[in-house]
Amino acid sequence: MFGKLLTKVFGSRNDRTLKGLQKIVISINALEADYEKLTDEALKAKTAEFRERLAAGASLDSIMAEAFATVREASKRVFDMRHFDVQLLGGMVLDSNRIAEMRTGEGKTLTATLPAYLNALTGKGVHVITVNDYLARRDAENNRPLFEFLGLTVGINVAGLGQHEKKAAYNADITYGTNNEFGFDYLRDNMAFSPQERVQRPLHYALIDEVDSILIDEARTPLIISGAAEDSSELYIKINTLIPNLIRQDKEDTEEYVGEGDYSIDEKAKQVHFTERGQEKVENLLIERGMLAEGDSLYSAANISLLHHVNAALRAHTLFERDVDYIVQDNEVIIVDEHTGRTMPGRRWSEGLHQAVEAKEGVHIQNENQTLASITFQNYFRQYEKLAGMTGTADTEAFEFQHIYGLDTVVVPTNRPMVRKDMADLVYLTADEKYQAIIKDIKDCRERGQPVLVGTVSIEQSELLARLMVQEKIPHEVLNAKFHEREAEIVAQAGRTGSVTIATNMAGRGTDIVLGGNWNMEIDELDNPTAEQKAKIKADWQIRHDEVVAAGGLHILGTERHESRRIDNQLRGRAGRQGDAGSSRFYLSMEDSLMRIFASDRVSGMMKKLGMEEGEAIEHPWVSRAIENAQRKVEARNFDIRKQLLEFDDVANDQRQVVYAQRNELMDAESIEDTIQNIQDDVIGAVIDQYIPPQSVEELWDIPGLEQRLHQEFMLKLPIQEWLDKEDDLHEESLRERIITAWGDAYKAKEEMVGAQVLRQFEKAVMLQTLDGLWKEHLAAMDHLRQGIHLRGYAQKNPKQEYKRESFELFQQLLNTLKHDVISVLSKVQVQAQSDVEEMEARRREEDAKIQRDYQHAAAESLVGGGDEHEAVTAQAPMIRDGEKVGRNDPCPCGSGRKYKQCHGKLS
């Protein structure tokens, strides 16, 4: 109550932010008259003027008003479009490391030109990031004339470009592209073998369109570059035949599992577990098929891989449904994004789940892959010096944007007042009653000529509704992942008089539904249209537009509530753009997933008390509140999972930072001779310590063992025992120095034989290849550690602390092994000439050709001991150093308590 009173007196934080920015809008508007008088040449010259001022020490803030006024005037001349004041506000929000919530139809694409131009003036590059190739190309081509008029270059970064094309795209002032491509390019750059192979510049300013989709929905999906692992498709096929023999355990309203059964499903957590009876049954079936030895347990250490396959098969059969979670197309299982309803070709569930689904559907089973490099969008985008985003629905996730990314959300007002009528939900007892009510509402809308957009949560539901409409002879269009090729065409005409469009959550995000249909698209379909043809098309459209407005505008009809309020708001946001008329309503039933799992008891009890009859709906604020509370519960749970996964992921950030930074230093260095010298002192010294313990008596020395080890691993044949027999005064330290010097002399002889330049190149190639191989193995070890770490909780240990401790130990091993292996290889390999280095490079490029890019969804339960099977386990990612460089004798920033040179600085 007091909070509301204070807001009334002082205004909300959002209001105060906008009030502060409004002063700059006034300054921009004051410049408009003067800028209108400028010639084109004078307006274009502003870009060079701004750059000179920045070079002289001016800040971006000091030139913002003039820069925005320049873009607004250029837009008027190039596009005949003037930025509204609210778009200027949006541009300022985006320049200040914030997220701008701008409603559908408010011109986010044009708004983005303001901060993109301003930040491109620094010459460091601007990345404008969208969710798919179509939107990236469309926005780049649409805005190219404006930016080129102002003297800036525009690049497009999409899938399928070659290295030179990508480098050109990144060197442009403003680069449009998809989040996936930017992430993959970062990974590829950190696998490059020469500076020339890198394509990205340092990450400066990212402006993300549909920021909620990328930073929230995609947050847990790691981008993975992988290579093929061993083929186990036969095992998946054999185990797939076991699952149909299993019976699900009954479940009553008491939430207690009762009755006989082999497995139980927890629908809230989206998990499945074997019962004791189920474990015994599976073991017996495996024994019958000769896959498990008589008397052996599926849970013994030797059978962990078999257990992994059985669990994957059970999840595939019980938790993943065709046409809901995936579709089968061209003999492939393709994941359907639960948030957008779009298919995601190329993405695969990890931990064998995708192969298990392929076995279930009887399609070709692709090999499992081994991770070579990976990063999550969370960690990739946190590396940008400046980060901003825009979307129509961010306010419900404002806390997460602030907590995870440090980004405040500002709700930008609409240019015209919102007049859409959002009606209360109607709740029915059964799905059949709900669908009959939906059909009746659609018929009513068609009678008065009102266009309808029907939003569904799955492909299966959209096809069910389509069948009902065919039965009722209602003309309609279906827009789902199976028919996405016609997406732009269907969305363009979804606002025509009396049209009915059924859409999954994708609902053509990024494309506005224009009342009366899209007249621009009609003109585009004509070859060289005349002015008369254009005028006629526009006049016809105006008549249709007025008819639709008179009928009530676009009517949004939701067939089910999504787990996230944000997705529901996105659907509602399709109507009421730019002050248009419109309406929305959700139809629900007690059989809907959200209602059944989270809100059933309270609402169904209320409905029973009211004594509802068949076909009757309940419409009450209490019901809407109960549903919203259910959605809040799910959102909070999903946020906790994302937060927890990120906490685990952050443990590995230091490691990736060290490896990638060291890799780039190695690649950029002309020579790593000093590094090799430091490493060889450490490696040879460590080997000597094993056979001649420091400060020990000679009786404890193992000289024969040391001689043999030095010869086997470093090709160093030294008469150490002979030295000791002949020289009584040869003590431990001088012996150590003599052995290290002997290795140095042998290596010097190798250098004289092949030439210093060839050996320097070879050293770099060996170091990079060894580091990459060990990093790949380290990633696999970290994956295995993550998958089982939650079990430490049963031993009264903190899984996060255990993960931190053990991952640090694994990294220590990586550093020690790297140094040892590099010196061992350099000692053994005989380099004859430059051709040997080139041959090594050729083999490496051949291996590179075999790697593939994956977007793998992994089960969250492996990390947190439970959770949504659709959640993805985050992967390690590097961070950019915020403060000063750490000195070699300073405490290591990882928190181990050791000096930096003895910890994460060991490689330097």
UniProtKB/Swiss-Prot annotation:
Catalytic activity: ATP + H2O + cellular proteinSide 1 = ADP + phosphate + cellular proteinSide 2
Amino acid composition bias (Basic residues), ranges on this chain: 898-908
Region spans: Disordered: 876-908
InterPro entries in the cross-refs: Helicase_ATP-bd, Helicase_C-like, P-loop_NTPase, SEC_C_motif, SecA, SecA_CS, SecA_DEAD, SecA_motor_DEAD
Binding site for Zn(2+): C892, C894, C903, H904
Cofactor annotation remark: May bind 1 zinc ion per subunit.
GO biological process, one term: intracellular protein transmembrane transport
Topology relative to the membrane: Peripheral membrane protein
Keywords: ATP-binding, Cell inner membrane, Cell membrane, Cytoplasm, Membrane, Metal-binding, Nucleotide-binding, Protein transport, Translocase, Translocation, Transport, Zinc
Sites where the protein binds ATP: Q87, G105, E106, G107, K108, T109, D512
Cell location: Cell inner membrane; Cytoplasm
GO cellular component entries: cell envelope Sec protein transport complex; cytosol; plasma membrane
Family the UniProt entry places it in: Belongs to the SecA family.
Protein name: Protein translocase subunit SecA
